[in-house]
């Protein structure tokens, strides 16, 4: 929110009246007196100018700080992370095929690159950061707990599989890499360490068993060694590289390729090796390249002075034990055995969880915020969060994170609380949390510059309350982590109040997402990015008098969670205050009054809306032969319920369980869900009714539909959760809810498994006409909720 500029008033300076000249009463003899030289004679005019400029700049800075104060973070919560978190290595670089670091800003970064050795001189296509353009047929963690170990397969099209397994141990880690590629092919694998802070230095060792030495203020002295399996040694050569240059973190792979040279020995195939001419004895980037055959296996061990080297059999045993414990807990929690799922469905289920946990990331640094018209650094932040997609969205998203943690909490509720606490620490003193956490240079490298700044008046769905609702109603979690829940309660309430105040609507019980563009002409329906539903149709002509159904429902859920927390951890006044908010926001009669249409039999947004708009080519002024697609309104807009767009947004009263189980309105909602002309498909619920004029409609000439027909798993999960609730409640519609639940679950599981088997991935969304996966892939985010959908404890 912009502050009003205060006028700066200066006191008026009145000119003094001239003094009257007095006549002397006596004549005084004049005695010449030596006058001092004017100060300007010994003071340079250049110096005067510099001083004036400095004074002006100082005044400007002080005035700017007064009128435009900086964003200020809340004080961090007491640390709830494990004591050894800064020293414990994990896969906290989710954008990489295989990368490790610790949860400390001082951690060195470990990474792996590889490419197939060309037979002719050319620039190799190197794999490093996850990239859809690499066109890999599949890569996923098939077992991973997000803390102690992981097992991953990376498939190369028609060439074979690279397997990466890892474990951590005290202050170090060990990894095993296996290449099982097509015969006759050769591969180069590059392993590197890079420094994040000045005090970290690396040196080269003398052989592979002592390949790197390093020092770091966090870890102390450490070494990295490579151990090749016997049959691998015979067909392996290696080269090393060390530099003290400052390399941009997103250009590591380019730097490696630029410093690679072709070596063509007589009667030998062409070999690419690293340039080993080193001008530095120590540096902040160090790499070793292994030239391997198609079948190879080697171990990587990073250890501090305090630890002994790990033997191959020790790695194998520890990995086996951790894998066993993971699988045992997995089955105890989700209980999929004996449920008649196919092998493909069971494989997809475990991959969905493992990818979610194996893609949890750690970031440190500032993000950028557009505050009072100026982009400012905001931070520093420490973010511990899952991500939606390793290649496309490898960073924290506030609206996604609540869904991520719905799954993670089932295996590791402590990890969920650590993630929620890190998001609460990103809050500013007013209660705002950035909707997208693009923190640090690695995260920024994956985002176009114009999309990096966040706006501090824009909210996002408070989905963390969705997972908190489950945590505070779980007796085991409450008993074990009461202290953490007590710490989180004031932050959650602050966030809740910020949303209620800044996103308020025209009346007390209505709310409006900020950020819609009232003047844009090139969009069919101006987007509501803050809602998370992006191009889902709202009122066609944005105004301050509109209000939004989903936001009202999110706040109703949040009020219930806060009341539960206040009862356990707040004062009597806290409890009374939250009870009042809960009663107001969960009042069904009020919801019906504000949002229900008896004629259309649905809940809807309200606003300035036209039922007759279209994107049409309009001649460009001054260039009659050129056209621009603009919104053309054939019928004047009026203030009304937006009843020509029924879809995901309109299901929120049911999804968040605000409709009484005996209300006829519930029957109407169930009927619309099951109607193939509206939302029902054989693959899941589509995002908007087929009868809506917005179904599969482009929002601009260049923007295809997004939330206008395709099937999204997070909302289907919310619908299933509510169906399970209503099927268990007394009322005339419980049998109908049970039947729809069973059919919808079966359709989702069958289609996602079909697409997983066909493509090797979970996808961002799915086509409502064919069931095919769409958008970015692999989508390790809320599409992984398919595992909860498959389990019987979907909503506990």
UniProtKB/Swiss-Prot annotation:
It is found in: Endoplasmic reticulum membrane. It catalyses: N(4)-(alpha-D-Glc-(1->2)-alpha-D-Glc-(1->3)-alpha-D-Glc-(1->3)-alpha-D-Man-(1->2)-alpha-D-Man-(1->2)-alpha-D-Man-(1->3)-[alpha-D-Man-(1->2)-alpha-D-Man-(1->3)-[alpha-D-Man-(1->2)-alpha-D-Man-(1->6)]-alpha-D-Man-(1->6)]-beta-D-Man-(1->4)-beta-D-GlcNAc-(1->4)-beta-D-GlcNAc)-L-asparaginyl-[protein] + H2O = N(4)-(alpha-D-Glc-(1->3)-alpha-D-Glc-(1->3)-alpha-D-Man-(1->2)-alpha-D-Man-(1->2)-alpha-D-Man-(1->3)-[alpha-D-Man-(1->2)-alpha-D-Man-(1->3)-[alpha-D-Man-(1->2)-alpha-D-Man-(1->6)]-alpha-D-Man-(1->6)]-beta-D-Man-(1->4)-beta-D-GlcNAc-(1->4)-beta-D-GlcNAc)-L-asparaginyl-[protein] + beta-D-glucose. GO terms for molecular function: Glc3Man9GlcNAc2 oligosaccharide glucosidase activity. It holds the Pfam family Glyco_hydro_63. Glycans are attached at residues 153, 340, 517. Residues 1-24 are annotated as: Disordered. GO terms for biological process: oligosaccharide metabolic process; protein N-linked glycosylation. Residues 1-10 have a biased composition (Basic and acidic residues). It is a single-pass type II membrane protein. A motif (Endoplasmic reticulum targeting) lies at residues 2-8. This is Mannosyl-oligosaccharide glucosidase. It comes from Caenorhabditis elegans.
């Amino acid at each position: 929110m912009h502050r009003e500029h205060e006028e700066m008033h200066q006191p008026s300076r009145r000119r003094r009246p001239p003094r009257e000249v007095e006549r002397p009463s006596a004549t005084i003899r004049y005695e010449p007196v030596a006058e001092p030289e004017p100060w300007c004679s010994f003071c340079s005019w250049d110096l005067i100018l510099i001083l004036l400029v400095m004074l002006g700049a100082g005044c400007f800075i002080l005035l700017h700080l007064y009128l435009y104060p900086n964003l200020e973070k809340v004080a961090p919560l007491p640390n709830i992370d494990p004591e050894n978190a800064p020293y414990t290595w994990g896969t906290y670089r989710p954008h990489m095929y295989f990368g490790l670091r610790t949860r400390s800003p001082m951690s060195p970064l470990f990474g792996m690159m590889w490419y197939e050795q060309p037979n002719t001189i050319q620039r190799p296509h190197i794999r490093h950061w996850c990239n859809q353009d690499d066109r890999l047929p599949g890569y996923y963690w098939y077992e991973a707990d997000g803390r102690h170990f992981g097992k991953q397969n990376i498939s190369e099209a028609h060439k074979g599989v690279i397997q990466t397994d890892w474990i951590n141990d005290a202050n170090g880690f060990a990894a095993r890499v296996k290449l099982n590629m097509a015969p006759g092919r050769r591969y180069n694998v590059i392993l590197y360490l890079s420094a994040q802070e000045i005090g970290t230095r690396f040196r080269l060792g003398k052989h592979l068993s002592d390949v790197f030495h390093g020092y770091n203020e966090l870890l102390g002295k450490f070494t990295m060694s490579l151990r090749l399996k016997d049959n691998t040694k015979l067909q392996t050569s290696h080269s090393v590289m060390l530099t003290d240059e400052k390399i941009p973190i997103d250009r590591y792979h380019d730097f490696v390729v630029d410093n690679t040279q072709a070596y063509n020995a007589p009667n030998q195939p062409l070999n690419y090796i690293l340039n080993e001419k080193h001008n530095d004895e120590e540096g902040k980037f160090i790499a070793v390249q292994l030239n391997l055959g198609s079948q190879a296996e080697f171990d990587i061990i990073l250890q501090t002075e305090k630890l002994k080297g790990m033997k191959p059999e020790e790695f194998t045993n520890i990995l086996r034990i951790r894998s066993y414990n993971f699988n045992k807990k997995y089955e105890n929690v989700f209980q999929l055995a004996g449920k008649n799922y196919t092998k493909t469905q069971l494989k997809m289920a475990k991959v969905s969880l493992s990818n979610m946990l194996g893609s949890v990331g750690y970031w440190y640094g500032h993000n950028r915020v557009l505050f009072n018209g100026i982009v400012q650094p905001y931070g520093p932040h420490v973010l511990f969060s899952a991500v939606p997609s390793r290649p496309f969205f490898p960073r924290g998203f506030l609206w996604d994170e609540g869904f991520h943690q719905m799954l993670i909490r089932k295996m590791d509720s402590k990890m969920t609380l650590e993630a929620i606490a890190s998001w609460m620490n990103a809050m500013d003193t007013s209660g705002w949390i950035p909707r997208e956490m693009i923190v640090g240079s690695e995260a920024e490298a994956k985002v176009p510059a114009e999309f990096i700044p966040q706006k501090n008046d824009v909210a996002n769905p408070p989905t963390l309350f969705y997972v908190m609702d489950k945590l505070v109603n779980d007796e085991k979690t409450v008993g074990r982590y009461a202290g953490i829940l007590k710490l989180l309660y004031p932050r959650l309430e602050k966030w809740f109040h910020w949303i209620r105040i800044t996103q308020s609507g025209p009346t007390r019980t209505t709310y409006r997402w900020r950020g819609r563009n009232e003047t844009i002409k090139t969009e069919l329906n101006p987007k509501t990015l803050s809602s998370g539903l992006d191009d889902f149709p709202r009122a066609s002509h944005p105004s301050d008098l509109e209000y939004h159904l989903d936001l009202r429902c999110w706040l109703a859920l949040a009020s219930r969670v806060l009341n539960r927390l206040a009862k356990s951890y707040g004062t009597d006044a806290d409890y009374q205050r939250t009870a009042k908010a809960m009663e107001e926001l969960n009042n069904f009669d009020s919801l019906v009054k504000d949002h229900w249409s008896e004629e259309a039999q649905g809940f809807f947004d309200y606003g300035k809306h036209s039922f007759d708009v279209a994107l049409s080519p309009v001649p460009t002024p001054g260039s009659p032969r050129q056209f621009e697609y603009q919104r053309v309104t054939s019928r004047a807009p009026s203030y009304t319920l937006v009843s020509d767009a029924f879809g995901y947004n309109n299901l929120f009263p049911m999804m968040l369980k605000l409709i009484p189980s005996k209300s006829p309105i519930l029957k109407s909602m169930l009927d619309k869900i099951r109607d193939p002309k509206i939302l029902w498909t054989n693959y899941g619920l589509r995002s908007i009714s087929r009868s809506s004029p917005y179904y599969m409609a482009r929002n601009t000439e260049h923007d295809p539909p997004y939330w206008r027909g395709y099937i999204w798993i997070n909302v289907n999960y919310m619908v299933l959760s509510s169906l399970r609730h209503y099927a268990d409640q007394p009322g005339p519609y419980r049998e109908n809810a049970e039947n729809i639940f069973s059919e919808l679950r079966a359709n989702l599981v069958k289609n996602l498994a079909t697409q997983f088997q066909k493509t090797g991935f979970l996808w961002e969304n799915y086509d409502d006409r064919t069931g095919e996966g769409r958008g970015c892939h692999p989508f390790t985010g809320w599409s992984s909720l398919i595992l909860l959908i498959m389990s019987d404890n979907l909503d506990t």
